[in-house]
Amino acid sequence: MKEEIIIAGFGGQGVLSMGKILAYCAIMQDMEVTWMPSYGPEMRGGTANVSVILSDKKISSPIVTKYDTAIILNQQSLDKFESTVKPGGLLIYDPNGIINPPTRTDIKICKIDAINVAAQVGNAKVYNMAVMGAYLKIKPIVSFDNIDKGLAKCIPARYSDLIALNKQAIEEGMKAVEEL
């Protein structure tokens, strides 16, 4: 099994954090992992993406040009990465901020209104975890038991009280994802 993922959106949407948490969850399952971020000089508002590879075998290269899954959080990222999803692959997107939705017919397309899920949970900062929940519902590559461990590894100890909130957002995101 090998899953090549691109997660892309604006800086501040938790793109890199989502990739890191997913990577740590996979590490807890003794999987091979690469996590390769890319972002501009802006702290927030610039585009950011992270390439994550999860595999049960050695990963020969972290460089990927075609992905099994694209998780897209803004129009610029959709324009850039929709064409990089392998035929038969998966594209998950949040329709908020997307003017021209994905159009490919050779891939599975799902949407998640993550802003709404985060509002229901009560904290806009868990937006990215709602999106991750959508991904894990469709592709349960990492076990739900390891999510706590992945969150604990990525969330600083002083914010450990937020682990339950993040996990709740993941669970709600799993319920809210829609296949198109």
Task: Describe the function of each predicted region.
Residues 1-180:
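Active-site cofactor/cluster-binding pocket
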